[in-house]
Amino acid sequence: MKFQNVHISHQDEDKEKLLPNDKDVEKADESPSSSRPSFVFKCYVIASMTFIWTAYTLTIKYTRSTVNPDMMYSSTSVVLCAEILKLVITFAMFYKECNFDSRQFSEQVSKYYINAPRELAKMSVPSFAYALQNNLDFVGLSNLDAGLYQVTTQLKVVSTAFFMMLFLGRKFSTRRWMAITLLMFGVAFVQMNNVSASEANTKRETAENYIVGLSAVLATCVTAGFAGVYFEKMLKDGGSTPFWIRNMQMYSCGVISASIACLTDFSRISDKGFFFGYTDKVWAVVILLGVGGLYISLVMRYLDNLYKSMASAVSIILVVVLSMLIFPDIFIGMYFVLGTICVVLAVLLYNSVNE
């Protein structure tokens, strides 16, 4: 099946499948410990996140590498659309959680959302960080091949560990520090693969700038680690604010921050139009980015960052394999294979420690 055959008409149906069923979430809450959801629920979330991240990485890479620069869409407008989509979905999910009772819905929204500016301000921190991360993702994927992007972004495990020590007072065992070190070596091997690729295939023409791409990925890792730990702390602080209200607060700030980001591209947007260059595949990016953001909050609430790392590890393998089928100019050498193995082993070792 060719990648070009993806149609936006299927995206709404896929979106319904990707979102967690309320009964699944209720089962997680009703378990003896909300921090220990069922095995089936864990598998569902991990499998869904793996699919979303793989599809998102490949789709955005395809849209940025196959379109004429003069017809390129605005990445800031895509992020804004995704933030609006997240906000709409969270309102719909909370309305469903209120059993479609308009009175209860309005009372809860008024109490926890409209009349709680202090809580809204708290959630603005990870919201702005995630918005920045999403825009950096476009820069990274536009200048790196999909496989390299997926592997290097695993540095967020390092930044996450740092922020968990800084904000949550966590201490890591020797085994986990070994995993972090192994991860760093894995990334180094992947970078060596780029050097090998350029030497082995000097005729390959590419507009990809690896320095810009790697810089964007490093910045993404820092913002992702910070936002993830902060958001997890907010969702697990024992407060009375409902889960979907927390998401409303964050994504409301996300819409604001994404709108501000659009101002940096204002001249282009005003000249060509907000939706210039949008195709069915670009709308697929919007939906995947929107639903993927919701799954991040779901993982932070019912699981933790370690399960997110598992999904990333599987996604790395899928992206590398599928990239070879979709992008004919992708070079996969022994350095890349070795680096990928190191990263996967590092993530597995990191997650093997029980706390």
Curated annotation (Swiss-Prot):
Primary location class: membrane
Annotated keywords: Membrane, Sugar transport, Transmembrane, Transmembrane helix, Transport
Compartments reported by the entry: Membrane; Cytoplasmic granule membrane
SUPFAM superfamilies: Multidrug resistance efflux transporter EmrE
Region feature Disordered, mapped onto this chain: 1-36
PANTHER family attached to this UniProt entry: NUCLEOTIDE-SUGAR TRANSMEMBRANE TRANSPORTER
Protein name in UniProt: UDP-galactose translocator 1
Native source organism of the sequence: Caenorhabditis elegans
